[in-house]
Amino acid sequence: MKKIILLICILIGVSSCDMIAEDIQESKNYFEDKKIRKNQNKIGLELLEKNTEKILWNRMELRIPKNSKINEVNGRLEYDGQALEIEFKYIPNKNNDDICFDVSTSFKEWYKKRNNELYLMYSNNFQSTKSNMRLAEKIAKENGFIECKNGLI
């Protein structure tokens, strides 16, 4: 493959070689992202049917799909090593009422306040991972999260 690219670069000029390499890398990234999203959607569909289990997350009991977990570093829901398009955030000592975004976003947002602690949950609205959005809606409902009404883009 590299020899073919090198031959093409020689034929069309050296300055185009960077552009071709860049296009190839962008193409690889696109197909890798597509593969990840397809896997996320498949897992989301599977988890919609699974039973839930209670976990303790930042001093709050949460019901999430069985055998899934919340990544401690980035807050994403994970199953079988795959991060889904569902993210949790914890904000201690949140005293004001500015919780939801004022503008429409490309993700849905839910919140739950307890004492002066704020628990947030987000789910991206990607067309290719709709099952993750449905799973997030189910998790939000089961755990008493309130949906922000800022709307999706």
Where are each of the predicted segments found?
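Classical Sec-dependent N-terminal signal peptides that target proteins to the secretory pathway
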Residues: 1-21
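A short, hydrophobic, proline-anchored segment that marks a local hinge/packing element in signaling
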Residues: 108-115
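N-terminal targeting sequences that direct proteins away from the cytosol to non-cytosolic compartments
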Residues: 17-84, 90-91, 114, 124-153
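Short, Gly/Ser/Thr-enriched beta-strand-loop segments that form substrate-interacting elements
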Residues: 83-107
